[in-house]
Amino acid sequence: MEASVVKIEPPGGDPLARFNSDYYEGLNAGQEVVRLGLKDPKDRASLHSRLEETDLLLTASRPAALGRLGLSWPELHARFPRLCHVAIVGHPPPDEDAPGHDLTYQARFGTLTPPELPRVLVADLAGAERAVSAALSLLLARERGQGAGYEQVALSEAARSFAEPLRQGLAAPGGDLGGGFPGYGLYHTREGHVALAALELHFWERLLQELGVKGDERRDLERIFETKTAKQWEEWAAERDLPLAAVRGIERNEEAEGDETAFVSERRRTSTRGEDKS
């Protein structure tokens, strides 16, 4: 979007840079990173100087914390009347100051399967997309003469929204997208698994015809998929315009660089963090 973005970090930096430097670098590519201690009056004055020429402020702090720093929306709007503000919070009012993270938001809406941790940070990523929409909406409204505005984006609400197919039964166990329909599911192959998504009738009928399935559809598919590897089935499906993909891992290596669909082992790796190797 060709926006000029300045990211304000605390003096110690963003913890993500320590946890996962590669991900941090990818997320912040093209941004100017400035470290400020906003409890320090001089650093706070530096922020105010930047806000004089800023179109949009995006925050991810609890409103009470922003208020203590003099960054509540009423204070900001009075001082910087052209500034729009998108505030990412954990929960909608009246609980916007309650603590939480992606894991606790997902826990509230049924998308966790203990003891496994979620592989996708649904609330964080969906919340980020909502924040972009909110930012564009506020800026467009300002350009149309409606003045600068403020909008909260609650991550828990993003988690709730993404859990709706589960809550409505569509993706629940036994639902059409939860194992109830044999044309939509995961199948074991001679090596690895495939994901089949033949939801539309023409895909489903073509699949059955190509494979010669006429009896117990699920049982026949389970038997047939065992005859080839996942990679072979994917190639077979591509030739027939069928929605089927091999299940992949997420590991990357030099050979796979540039090919995010590289086939990798599905075996779980045991974490060695904190392991004594002496």
Model-derived regions, located:
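Short, well-ordered alpha-helix to beta-strand connector turns
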Residues: 2, 30-31, 54, 101, ...
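Glycine-rich phosphate-binding loop and adjoining beta1-alpha1-beta2 segment
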Residues: 2-33
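Hydrophobic/aromatic beta-strand patches that form the interior of the parallel beta-sheet core
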Residues: 6-8, 34, 58, 84-86, ...
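A structured beta-alpha segment of the ubiquitous adenosine-cofactor-binding alpha/beta core
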Residues: 24-78
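N-terminal Rossmann-like NAD(P) cofactor-binding subdomain of oxidoreductases
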Residues: 40, 59-113
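Flexible, small-/acidic-enriched active-site or ligand-binding loops
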Residues: 257-278
